[in-house]
UniProtKB/Swiss-Prot annotation:
Belongs to the hssA/B family. It comes from Dictyostelium discoideum (Social amoeba). This is HssA/B-like protein 12. Pfam families: Coiled (PF05710). PANTHER family: HSSA/B-LIKE PROTEIN 17-RELATED (PTHR31857), HSSA_B-LIKE PROTEIN 17-RELATED (PTHR31857:SF2).
């Protein structure tokens, strides 16, 4: 096998791996959003920014998951605001 062929095969493995990671992310996000009620407290602007960034990344890769932004907002809100806020 030539060096060029081995490099191209490594590139193929990486692209397959990335595809699997995104599909598992969307599946776990959908499952967690169906079973966990999340709500942030305090209204920190950082929470909305993180949610919007994650939503933009998912839409940019072709995976559209509408519930991910709300779930991320709740989780991050719980982490930033204290033990009484977040997912229940």
């Amino acid at each position: 096998m030539t060096l060029l062929a081995s490099i191209s095969s490594i590139g193929n493995v990486k692209s397959i791996s990335k595809s699997n990671n995104f599909s598992s992310l969307s599946n776990s996000s959908l499952q967690s959003s169906n079973s966990i009620q999340c709500g942030g407290c305090g209204g920190s602007p950082l929470i909305g920014t993180v949610g919007n960034l994650v939503g933009g990344v998912l839409v940019g890769t072709g995976i559209i998951v509408g519930t991910v932004v709300g779930t991320v907002n709740g989780v991050v809100g719980g982490l930033l605001s204290g033990p009484n806020c977040g997912c229940h």
